Swiss-Prot record:
TM helices/strands, residue ranges: 27-49
Family as reported in the entry's similarity comment: Belongs to the ATPase B chain family.
Other known facts: In plastids the F-type ATPase is also known as CF(1)CF(0).
Protein name: ATP synthase subunit b, chloroplastic
Role played: F(1)F(0) ATP synthase produces ATP from ADP in the presence of a proton or sodium gradient. F-type ATPases consist of two structural domains, F(1) containing the extramembraneous catalytic core and F(0) containing the membrane proton channel, linked together by a central stalk and a peripheral stalk. During catalysis, ATP synthesis in the catalytic domain of F(1) is coupled via a rotary mechanism of the central stalk subunits to proton translocation. Component of the F(0) channel, it forms part of the peripheral stalk, linking F(1) to F(0).
Gene name of this polypeptide: atpF
Record GO terms (molecular function): ATP binding; proton-transporting ATP synthase activity, rotational mechanism
Keyword Chloroplast: yes
Cell location: Plastid, Chloroplast thylakoid membrane
Subunit annotation: F-type ATPases have 2 components, F(1) - the catalytic core - and F(0) - the membrane proton channel. F(1) has five subunits: alpha(3), beta(3), gamma(1), delta(1), epsilon(1). F(0) has four main subunits: a(1), b(1), b'(1) and c(10-14). The alpha and beta chains form an alternating ring which encloses part of the gamma chain. F(1) is attached to F(0) by a central stalk formed by the gamma and epsilon chains, while a peripheral stalk is formed by the delta, b and b' chains.
InterPro entries the UniProt entry points to: ATP_synth_b/b'su_bac/chlpt
């Protein structure tokens, strides 16, 4: 009876260094598997993730540059509009008697259309930046999930085979049979 109890105690502990045995502690086994999977993901995924983020950063920076160029063009148009405004104001002084209200209305329309154009360029820039950022985040999430899944499947496939399953099942059947003998 003592030998049977000693064999169960031996099966419940980690095997000593240099020997082979089964770890029946499911919680400890899962922690080891998780730490191995996370280590592999961090080791292999770091380079791919940084390359992906660098590429995305370059695209966003290019988009920002393009938006800044558009903004510069809008400012240039604004300056041209201001020059035209000055000209219109000079003409207004000359034609004040004939139609001051008409010139004032034209001036306001010109200013409003210029500011609307500038606001549209600014909104376009902000929407483009926000879209590119969200797209980058979604792609990174998808890439990390795919790599994690591939790594986990690879680890599981490399660790589990038919012989290991059969030996584990046989060991558990033997332990169950020994437990039935003890209770009988």
């Amino acid at each position: 009876m003592k030998n049977v109890t000693d064999s169960f105690v031996f099966l419940g502990h980690w095997p000593s260094a240099g020997s082979f045995g089964f770890n029946t502690d499911i919680l400890a086994t899962n922690l080891i598997n998780l730490s191995v999977v996370l280590g592999v993901l961090i080791f292999f995924g770091k380079g791919v993730l940084s390359d992906l983020l660098d590429n995305r950063k370059q695209r966003i920076l290019n988009t920002i540059r393009n938006s800044e160029e558009l903004r510069g063009k809008a400012i240039e148009q604004l300056e041209k509009a201001r020059a035209r405004l000055k000209k219109v104001e000079m003409d207004a002084d000359q034609f004040r008697v004939n139609g001051y209200s008409e010139i004032e209305r034209e001036k306001m329309n010109l200013i409003n259309s210029t500011y609307k154009t500038l606001e549209q360029f600014e909104n376009y820039k902000n929407e483009t930046i926000q879209f590119e950022q969200q797209k980058a985040i979604n792609q990174v999430r998808q890439r990390v999930f795919q790599q994690a899944l591939q790594g986990a499947l690879g680890t599981l496939n490399s660790c589990l085979n038919n012989e290991l399953h059969l030996r584990t099942i046989n060991a558990n059947i033997g332990m169950f049979g020994a437990m039935n003998e003890i209770t009988d």
